[in-house]
C-alpha cells in the first residue's frame, strides 16, 4: 500500500475514534449555541487556523450552533506601524483615536473577518461575516476608566440585538463577528473582543463560551502574564 494512502487511512481511523468517543457530548450539545472567541496562535499559525475552522464546521455538521467572535490585535498593530502610528494601550485596552478606529475597522472587517469566512467555506461550511454594527447587533457607549483617562473610541456594550445571529444560525450558516459597535449617532466603537464574546454569549444564553487565546488565564494586570489569578470566586469576577 502506498505510504500516503496508509497515512490517510490512519488519519481517518484516528478521526473516527475521536468521533465515537465524542458521541455522548455531541448528543448533549445538539441544537445548543457555542460562542467561540477566536484569537492567539490559532489565528496566526496557518495549520492551526485551518484545523480550527475544520473543527468549527464539524460542530455545525453535528447539530451545534457555533458563533465566532474574533480579535485582531497583532494585525492592527502591524498596520498602524506601517502607517507610522505607534499603538498605545492602557490597562489592556487600545487607545483608539480617529485615525486608529479607521484602521481597526479596516483590518477587522476588511481583512481578518473575510479570511475567517474564506477558511470556513473552504472547509465545507457556510459562513457569514458581520460586525457588531450590522443589524444593530452591538450598541455601545464611551467606556469609563477609573483614572479618568480618555481612550477615544473604545466602547462599553450597552445592548446586544442578537436577532441577526439567530437568523444566520437558523439558515444553517456560521456567523463570524468583528467586535465593533455602533450608537444612536452612528459612531463606530472599538470593543474588546473578549468582552464582546462574553456579552454575545450571555444574550444568546449560549451553552458554552470558549476562548481560543495565548493568554494563560485571568490576569490581574492584562499587560503582565505573571499576574495570573489561579483561583477566583464568581462573586469576585462580578
Regions found by a protein language model. Name each.
Residues 1-238:
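Nucleotide/pyrophosphate-binding catalytic subdomain
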Amino acid at each position: 500500500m502506498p505510504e500516503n494512502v496508509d497515512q490517510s487511512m490512519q488519519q481517518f481511523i484516528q478521526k473516527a475514534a475521536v468521533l465515537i468517543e465524542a458521541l455522548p457530548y455531541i448528543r448533549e450539545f445538539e441544537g445548543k449555541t457555542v460562542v467561540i472567541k477566536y484569537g492567539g496562535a490559532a489565528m496566526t499559525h496557518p495549520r492551526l487556523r485551518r484545523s480550527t475552522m475544520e473543527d468549527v464546521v464539524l460542530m455545525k455538521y453535528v447539530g451545534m450552533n457555533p458563533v465566532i467572535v474574533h480579535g485582531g490585535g497583532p494585525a492592527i498593530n502591524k498596520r498602524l506601524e506601517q502607517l507610522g502610528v505607534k499603538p498605545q494601550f492602557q490597562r489592556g485596552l487600545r487607545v483608539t483615536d480617529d485615525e486608529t478606529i479607521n484602521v481597526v475597522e479596516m483590518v477587522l472587517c476588511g481583512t481578518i473577518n473575510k479570511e475567517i469566512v474564506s477558511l470556513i467555506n473552504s472547509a465545507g461550511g457556510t459562513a457569514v461575516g458581520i460586525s457588531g454594527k450590522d443589524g444593530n447587533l452591538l450598541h455601545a457607549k464611551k467606556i469609563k476608566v477609573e483614572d479618568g483617562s480618555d481612550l477615544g473610541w473604545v466602547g462599553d456594550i450597552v445592548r446586544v440585538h442578537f436577532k441577526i445571529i439567530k437568523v444566520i444560525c437558523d439558515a444553517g450558516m456560521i456567523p463570524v463577528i468583528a467586535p465593533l459597535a455602533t450608537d444612536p449617532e452612528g459612531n463606530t466603537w472599538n470593543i474588546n473582543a473578549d468582552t464582546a464574546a462574553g456579552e454575545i454569549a450571555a444574550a444568546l444564553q449560549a451553552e458554552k463560551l470558549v476562548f481560543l487565546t495565548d493568554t494563560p488565564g485571568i490576569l490581574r494586570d492584562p499587560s503582565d502574564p505573571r499576574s495570573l489569578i489561579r483561583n477566583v470566586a464568581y462573586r469576585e469576577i462580578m
